[in-house]
Amino acid sequence: MNLNIQKKRVEPFLKWAGGKSQLLEQFKSLFPKEGSYRRYIEPFIGGGAVFFYLEPKEAIISDLNKDLIEAYKIVKSHPKELISLLKKYEKQHSKEFYLKIRDEYNANKLDKINKAAHLIYLNKTCFNGLYRVNSKGEFNVPFGQHKKFTVNKEGILAASKILKKTKIEHT
């Protein structure tokens, strides 16, 4: 009996400019076959659509954006604490709360777990999921009119599991 069960793919926990999520089916035939490579190396991880799609057994991921890389490290090492913070944000979600979180993020006085939670919240609730900073290095994307913010607990836990086998570097 052939049930043809497909494994559910892990979705990126962030939206990022240049993301490949929409193109994965088109690119599928171009990806290396599982087992045909020893290590996956991604120098510009962004949202990580290809990385999460391939779920490599061994990987090195990197990016120039330090906050992005720190968020990946937090998802890898502290997913439950991160989810707990994001659940609190879920309950407080509003334009005013978004602006408060954005100000705190820009003040650059947060510990790594709070900084990652702020980045994920801002990314999921800002206009078009953009990451943009001004000349002072401050995140300045406006609120995206999202009526609701929902934490993807299962997605973060699944991403954490894949990231456990991954070396994460800031370049």
Predicted regions and their residues:
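SAM-dependent nucleic-acid methyltransferase catalytic core
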Residues: 2-24, 29-34, 78-171
